[in-house]
Amino acid sequence: MIQQESRLKVADNSGAREVLVIKVLGGSGRRYANIGDVVVATVKDATPGGVVKKGQVVKAVVVRTKRGVRRPDGSYIRFDENACVIIRDDKSPRGTRIFGPVARELRDKDFMKIISLAPEVI
């Protein structure tokens, strides 16, 4: 369950390696984020020369969770880690590459650019 103070791995080449969730967007008392939800986060670890720097506040969309998500057919999809992709305000990714698989649920939430860049959509 992704909530405030959760740390997420960054699954793109924007320069950030790890972020810490500040807020889950979508409602005043919203506590948890799942796949496809947007969070406000701060960069805790970054590569030198990247687009985003350590300490910067960014928006990110959750693309993988350990908790997983239930599909309409009753099956569950789970991943080995909690990961996100840093995005701009228009839902486009800040980086130019996506690493690792992403869930099909992102298509329902209109993150088509992330879907097209991802090496595998599960």
From Swiss-Prot:
Gene3D superfamilies: Ribosomal protein L14. SMART domains: Ribosomal_L14 (SM01374). It comes from the Bacteria. GO terms for molecular function: large ribosomal subunit rRNA binding; structural constituent of ribosome. GO terms for biological process: translation. Keywords: Ribonucleoprotein, Ribosomal protein, RNA-binding, rRNA-binding. PROSITE patterns: RIBOSOMAL_L14 (PS00049). It holds the Pfam family Ribosomal_L14. GO terms for cellular component: cytosolic large ribosomal subunit. Belongs to the universal ribosomal protein uL14 family. Forms a cluster with proteins L3 and L19. In the 70S ribosome, L14 and L19 interact and together make contacts with the 16S rRNA in bridges B5 and B8. Part of the 50S ribosomal subunit. Forms part of two intersubunit bridges in the 70S ribosome. Binds to 23S rRNA. This is Large ribosomal subunit protein uL14. It comes from Geobacillus stearothermophilus (Bacillus stearothermophilus). The gene is rplN.
